[in-house]
C-alpha cells in the first residue's frame, strides 16, 4: 500500500513540474502578422535561435490538415484544400523564417497560428490574411 501511495505521489509531482519546464518567451518576432488579400512573402529576423516551427489552424475542421510540423527547411499547411501559407526556415538553431502567402480568393479572412520553439521555450505568432 505504501508503495502505491509513493508511486502516485511521485507521478503527481512529475506531472505538476512539466509546465514549469516550458515557458513562453519572445524570440523577437511580432505577435501578429497581417497580409493583404494579394498575398506576398516576407522575412522575419528574431533575436534568438529556435529549433522548430509548428503551424496550426486555430479553428480546425474535420477536413483540415490542422497541424504541420518541421525541423526541415520548409513546412507548409493546407487550408480548405487550398495551400495558402508556406513557412521556410534554415532548420535547427536558425533565428529567422520566411512566410509565403498565396492570394486569398475565398473572399473571407483566414488565419494560421505559428509556434516558434526551442524545446523548452516558445513564442506564438498569429498569421492573418485579409479576405
Give the location of each predicted region.
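Bacterial Sec-dependent N-terminal signal peptides
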Residues: 1-2, 13-36
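Sec-dependent signal peptide recognition
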Residues: 2-8
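Structural beta-strand segments of beta-rich domains
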Residues: 31, 40-44, 97
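Hydrophobic loop/turn residues within beta-sheet-rich immunoglobulin-like superfamily modules
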Residues: 38, 47-49, 102-104
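Surface-exposed binding patches on compact interaction domains or structured appendages
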Residues: 46-96
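Short, hydrophobic beta-strand segments
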Residues: 95-105
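A short beta-strand micro-motif common to beta-rich folds, especially ectodomain repeats
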Residues: 106-120
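C-terminal edge beta-strand
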Residues: 120-131
Amino acid at each position: 500500500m505504501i508503495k502505491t501511495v509513493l508511486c502516485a505521489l511521485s507521478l503527481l509531482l512529475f506531472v505538476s513540474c512539466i509546465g514549469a519546464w516550458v515557458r513562453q518567451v519572445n524570440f523577437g518576432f511580432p505577435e501578429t502578422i497581417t497580409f493583404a488579400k494579394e498575398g506576398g512573402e516576407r522575412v522575419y529576423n528574431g533575436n534568438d535561435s529556435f529549433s522548430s516551427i509548428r503551424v496550426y489552424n486555430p479553428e480546425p475542421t474535420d477536413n483540415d490538415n490542422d497541424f504541420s510540423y518541421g525541423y526541415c527547411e520548409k513546412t507548409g499547411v493546407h487550408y480548405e484544400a487550398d495551400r495558402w501559407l508556406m513557412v521556410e526556415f534554415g532548420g535547427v538553431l536558425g533565428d529567422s523564417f520566411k512566410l509565403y502567402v498565396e492570394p486569398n480568393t475565398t473572399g473571407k479572412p483566414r488565419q494560421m497560428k505559428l509556434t516558434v520553439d526551442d524545446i523548452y521555450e516558445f513564442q506564438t505568432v498569429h498569421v492573418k490574411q485579409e479576405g
